[in-house]
Amino acid sequence: MGGYVNIKTFTHPAGEGKEVKGMEVSVPFEIYSNEHRIADAHYQTFPSEKAAYTTVVTDAADWRTKNAAMFTPTPVSG
């Protein structure tokens, strides 16, 4: 699949006397999807004000576990 993922971040505080500078970057979709393990995953994201699904992850450790599970192969039931 061609095209680009375009990401814009904004400068924001990062602790006492520090900040993360905003930046703009365009990444070829293939590189982005491979690095984020979404290649061939029929992956979709969309912003919303409220959670769209009943499973809601609220901390980073839980997200790492859930994210890994999203891409863990299991036997095909038939």
Curated annotation (Swiss-Prot):
Protein name: Small outer capsid protein
InterPro entries given in the database record: Soc, Soc_sf
Functional summary from the UniProt entry: Capsid decoration protein which helps to stabilize the capsid against extremes of pH and temperature. Once maturation and expansion of the capsid has occured, trimers of soc attach the interfaces between the hexamer of the major capsid protein. Acts as a 'glue' between neighboring hexameric capsomers. Dispensable for the head morphogenesis and phage infection.
Gene3D superfamilies: Small outer capsid protein Soc
Primary residence: virion
Family: Belongs to the Tevenvirinae Soc family.
Organism annotation: Escherichia phage RB69
Cellular compartments annotated: Virion
Classification via HAMAP family: SOC_T4 (MF_04115)
Gene Ontology CC, one term: viral capsid, decoration
Keywords: Capsid decoration protein, Capsid protein, Virion
Subunit structure: Homotrimer. Interacts with the major capsid protein; three soc molecules associate with each interface between the major capsid protein facets.
Signal peptide: none
